[in-house]
Every structure is written in structure tokens, then in C-alpha cells.
């Protein structure tokens, strides 16, 4: 059985998956996914605004809200896509430990999307957006968590 650790560094507009095969082995990039939809704003996605309503009595007006913002929906879909890849890797026994690194809101999306079996492999999480930094700088943020 391997002792590999997978480190997922993700944000709404992309993700990188690294593997560490043990102390002194460093980080190996497994994949890099660009998700450009994650950069869009609600106004870019929502052309059909919910509209307004009027009080049945009086002169009040209220905006109607949609159930979920389009950007939140896209983030959830991307988190589910990443979760499927993590499940596949677990099913293939490619790793035994998992570290999640993401900005806090997207980290919540990832946790919600993970299966219970995959979530049980999480050894640490970092609630920071480190998606844009170089791998050699990333290792400085992981030294207390993974022996690289």
C-alpha cells in the first residue's frame, strides 16, 4: 500500500493537484485545471434578473431574489468535478492522505462535495487562496503539514 499524499490547491477559477510520495520527495504536479467561468461575476452570468414586487397595500417595492447566485452555482459544480477526480484517485488507491488548500468559501464547497470516504482521508486543510503561487513557494506553506 502506498503512503502518497495528494494536495489539492484550488479556487473558483482553477485547481492544481500535487502528489507527495514521502519525506524528501517534494511535490509532483499531477494536473492543472483552468476554470475560466470561476472568474465571471454574477452580472456577467445573470441576464434574467428576478424583478420587483409591490406591497399589496401601500407604496413599498421589493426586489425578488433568485434561489442561488450563478457564481455560487458554478463554484459548486466545479467543486463536484474536483470531488469526482479525488474519488477516482482514492478508488484507484493512488493516495492515502489528502490535504485541501482553498480560499475559505470554496473550501466549504469542496468539503460539501466530497464523499464521506474521501473526506475521511483529509489530514489537513488550509483556508487560504494559494492557487496563484509557484509550487516552490507553495511548499513553504505546507512544511508544517507534509514532510516534503
Ranges and model annotations:
Residues 1-148:
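Terminal alpha-helical anchor/extension segments at protein ends
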Amino acid at each position: 500500500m502506498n503512503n502518497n499524499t495528494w494536495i489539492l490547491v484550488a479556487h473558483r477559477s482553477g485547481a492544481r493537484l500535487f502528489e507527495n510520495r514521502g519525506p524528501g520527495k517534494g511535490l509532483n504536479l499531477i494536473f492543472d485545471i483552468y476554470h475560466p467561468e470561476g472568474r465571471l461575476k454574477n452580472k456577467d452570468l445573470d441576464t434574467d434578473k428576478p424583478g420587483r414586487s409591490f406591497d399589496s397595500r401601500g407604496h413599498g417595492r421589493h426586489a425578488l431574489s433568485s434561489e442561488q447566485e450563478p457564481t455560487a452555482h458554478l463554484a459548486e459544480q466545479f467543486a463536484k468535478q474536483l470531488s469526482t477526480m479525488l474519488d477516482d484517485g482514492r478508488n484507484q488507491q493512488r493516495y492515502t492522505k489528502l490535504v485541501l488548500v482553498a480560499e475559505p468559501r470554496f473550501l466549504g464547497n469542496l468539503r460539501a462535495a466530497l464523499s464521506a470516504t474521501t473526506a475521511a482521508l483529509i489530514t489537513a486543510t488550509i483556508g487560504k487562496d494559494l492557487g496563484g503561487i509557484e509550487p516552490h513557494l507553495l511548499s513553504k506553506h505546507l512544511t508544517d503539514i507534509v514532510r516534503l
